[in-house]
Amino acid sequence: MSIIGSFPPGGPRVEVQETRVQTDRVLTIPNILSMARLAGVPLFLWLILRPEFGGPQSDGWALLVLALSGVSDYLDGKLARRWNQISSLGRLLDPAADRLYILSTLVGLTWREILPLWLTLVLLAREAMLLVMVGILRRHGYPPPQVNFLGKAATFNLMYAFPLLLLSDGSGWIASLAAVFGWAFAGWGTTLYWWAGVLYVVQVRRLVRADVAAD
């Protein structure tokens, strides 16, 4: 749910995205789905890089792992909310899996020269910026920012873009069509990814300024 954090008169009002923890259990169905999604990261990276090391083409299997990851990403959040199984572990696993899939896909597609290096660096720079913000929040006693709608929308766009771009690494009309839609999703995803990152920076700045003013 979305809550508004109020500060002393004259202070900023910061919108914070928060999901209330409803259980301390670890072995819930949503958490198991998130763990399975995390376990798929090295498998996906191995499948996508096999051709680069003399192995057979495994793009079909890599696409399947990515598709299953997307399905589990949708299900773990939906089931956690429906069954009141939102947990502290789940709140860590879900964004961790998202970021690891994005990172592994960036590595694989850049290594195979499907993605240009500049785009990979742009996306990694956003991640580095967010890590700095998390460090600042921790120093002031705040938890890491929760994933908001904009950040989730950016992730979904990128997770649509990457399999389409992988599919475009071929010939024929299907590859050409995949390239068009893949780059469209990549453009939107990168824009939203940075937009969400800038909003995090603005929120962190306001929180820190409010902290300093309170002292």
From Swiss-Prot:
One of its GO terms (molecular function) is CDP-diacylglycerol-glycerol-3-phosphate 3-phosphatidyltransferase activity. One of its GO terms (biological process) is glycerophospholipid biosynthetic process. Highest activity found with Co(2+) whereas Mn(2+) supports a lower activity; no activity detected with Ni(2+), Ca(2+) or Mg(2+). Pfam families: CDP-OH_P_transf. It comes from the Bacteria. It catalyses: a CDP-1,2-diacyl-sn-glycerol + a 1,2-diacyl-sn-glycero-3-phospho-(1'-sn-glycerol) = a cardiolipin + CMP + H(+). It is an enzyme of class 2 (transferase). Belongs to the CDP-alcohol phosphatidyltransferase class-I family. Its main location: membrane. GO terms for cellular component: plasma membrane. Keywords: Cell membrane, Lipid biosynthesis, Lipid metabolism, Membrane, Phospholipid biosynthesis, Phospholipid metabolism, Transferase, Transmembrane, Transmembrane helix. This is Cardiolipin synthase (CMP-forming). It is found in: Cell membrane. It is a multi-pass membrane protein.
